[in-house]
């Protein structure tokens, strides 16, 4: 295992105090470091593997460090590790060790494994530049499957990617269209049906679900008059759907517009 520290590890004392197992190699934070895979028993198709990376000791890094990374070594399979926001300047994840895709490509590596962004994204296919994301969703903004990328290298040193789920608990936002529903109980029935379908289709893991009810319906006033009471009924209905926890219920319905006579 080769790892680098990012902003979360730099900001907290506990990860720095943990004693790592003998098979784990943590890369330096002062400057980029290269590790020959032979030192840790790693080879690919009888080809040498080199890991290039730098961890960070600070929770805030504004510097582009990529140009300090060494060029990839010819004849070896070169893997780059970097904790970075790329060129992003806003959104959920703060700007961190910013760089461009062209900066990464200039190092002539065969694979870039990036951290910091929690959503899995393949930024570029050739050479692969990949955010595997985090391995467990922590809240509704991290919905969907979470895991890692399994990288297989063929006899021509060409990598192929396969996403492997690792999460043990999955978040999901469930939108239920209640258009035309006349009564609150009708809406409950629609939600119950949707929850059962969700568990049937994605129920290999326990689910945490945010239910969003939309649409124009006569039941709107009934729902709007006591939203928390109806939300509790949704939670009770979910108990019969399987391993589902309803995190929140949001009623975004509207009254039916009556055409002027």
Stretch-by-stretch model annotation:
Residues 163:
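Catalytic core of bacterial cyclic-dinucleotide metallophosphodiesterases
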Residues 166-261:
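Accessory, non-catalytic peripheral segments of nucleic-acid enzymes
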């Amino acid at each position: 295992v080769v790892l680098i520290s990012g902003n979360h590890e730099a900001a907290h004392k506990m990860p720095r105090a943990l004693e790592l197992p003998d098979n784990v190699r943590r890369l330096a934070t002062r400057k980029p470091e290269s590790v020959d895979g032979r030192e840790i028993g790693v080879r690919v198709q009888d080809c040498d593997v080199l890991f290039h990376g730098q961890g960070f000791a600070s929770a805030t890094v504004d510097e582009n460090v990529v140009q300090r990374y060494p060029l990839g070594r010819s004849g070896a399979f070169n893997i780059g590790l970097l904790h970075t926001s790329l060129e992003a300047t806003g959104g959920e994840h703060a700007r961190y060790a910013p760089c461009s895709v062209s900066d990464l490509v200039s190092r002539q590596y065969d694979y870039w494994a990036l951290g910091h962004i929690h959503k899995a994204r393949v930024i570029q296919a050739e050479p692969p530049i990949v955010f595997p994301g985090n391995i467990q969703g922590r809240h509704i903004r991290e919905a969907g499957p979470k895991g890692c990328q399994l990288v297989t290298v063929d006899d021509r040193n060409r990598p192929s990617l396969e996403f492997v789920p690792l999460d043990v608990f999955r978040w999901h936002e469930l939108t239920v269209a209640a258009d035309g529903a006349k009564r609150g109980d009708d809406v409950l029935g629609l939600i119950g049906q949707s929850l059962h379908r969700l568990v049937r289709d994605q129920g290999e893991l326990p689910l945490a679900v945010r239910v969003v009810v939309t649409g124009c319906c006569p039941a709107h006033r009934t729902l709007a008059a006591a939203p928390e009471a109806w939300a509790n009924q949704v939670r009770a209905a979910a108990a019969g759907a399987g391993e589902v926890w309803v995190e929140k219920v949001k009623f975004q319905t509207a009254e039916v517009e009556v055409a002027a006579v």
